[in-house]
């Protein structure tokens, strides 16, 4: 592996970037100008595509990334980030943006655990985690339908006891080649239904 080559290259580029003041066009505040927090996937195809497809530029939104755009625990780091964005950083809406052809679709925990063993993680470590109550197979399992996964995450956020009831939570799926967005859940419509019931 060429870790040192990558880090060296990054640091060389960074030195030029700073000395040539290439950061100037990216200056903004920590507050998202579009009052939006987005949870999306770490897929490399979305790095530039997603902001372009959503009409976002630097400073418009808080973007939280993880494997699969999944909110897997109501008190995990993703949910904490959403709450911080809302209460401390002036975000007023949440978008979960999953994508087609996601690596988390059909992810098999056994495959990951085998690869971990091949790279030096010992059975004794896995056994210790299991005996401590961690269900590795569930924790490392993906989803079967991106739409269902997005809906599940939206519902977990929307029903969180610390989320203000008036915050719209949208669920979208993006195509990683074209950037086409499909709406799974329109948070405005959900809000209208809740206000009339």
Curated annotation (Swiss-Prot):
UniProt cross-references to SMART domains, sorted A to Z: Pro_CA
InterPro entries per the UniProt record, alphabetical: Carbonic_anhydrase, Carbonic_anhydrase_sf
Cofactor field: Zn(2+)
Catalytic EC class: lyase
Binding site for Zn(2+): 41, 43, 99, 102
MF annotations from Gene Ontology: carbonate dehydratase activity; zinc ion binding
Keywords, in A-Z order: Lyase, Metal-binding, Zinc
Keyword Ligase tagged: no
Catalytic activity: hydrogencarbonate + H(+) = CO2 + H2O
Stretches assigned to coiled coil: none
EC number: 4.2.1.1
Xref: Pfam families: Pro_CA
PANTHER family referenced in this protein's UniProt entry, alphabetically: CARBON DISULFIDE HYDROLASE (PTHR43175:SF3), CARBONIC ANHYDRASE (PTHR43175)
Described function: Reversible hydration of carbon dioxide.
Assigned protein family: Belongs to the beta-class carbonic anhydrase family.
Protein name per its UniProtKB record: Putative carbonic anhydrase YvdA
Natural source organism: Bacillus subtilis (strain 168)
Lineage: Bacteria, Bacillati, Bacillota, Bacilli, Bacillales
């Amino acid at each position: 592996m060429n870790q040192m080559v990558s880090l060296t290259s990054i640091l060389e580029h960074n030195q030029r970037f700073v000395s040539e003041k290439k950061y100037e066009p990216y200056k903004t505040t920590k507050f998202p100008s579009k009052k939006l927090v987005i949870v999306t996937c770490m897929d490399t195809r979305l790095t530039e595509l997603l902001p372009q497809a959503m009409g976002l530029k630097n400073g418009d939104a808080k973007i939280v990334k993880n494997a699969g755009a999944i909110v897997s625990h109501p008190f995990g780091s993703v949910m904490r980030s959403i709450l911080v964005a809302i209460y401390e950083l002036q975000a007023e809406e949440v978008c979960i943006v999953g994508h087609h052809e996601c690596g988390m679709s059909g992810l098999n925990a056994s495959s990951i655990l085998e690869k971990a063993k091949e790279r030096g993680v010992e059975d004794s470590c896995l056994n210790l985690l299991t005996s401590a109550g961690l269900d590795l197979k569930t924790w490392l399992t993906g989803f079967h339908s991106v739409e269902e996964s997005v809906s599940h995450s939206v519902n977990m956020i929307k029903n969180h006891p610390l989320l203000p009831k008036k915050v719209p939570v949208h669920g979208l799926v993006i195509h990683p080649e074209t950037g086409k967005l499909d709406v799974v859940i329109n948070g405005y419509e959900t809000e209208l239904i809740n206000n009339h019931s």
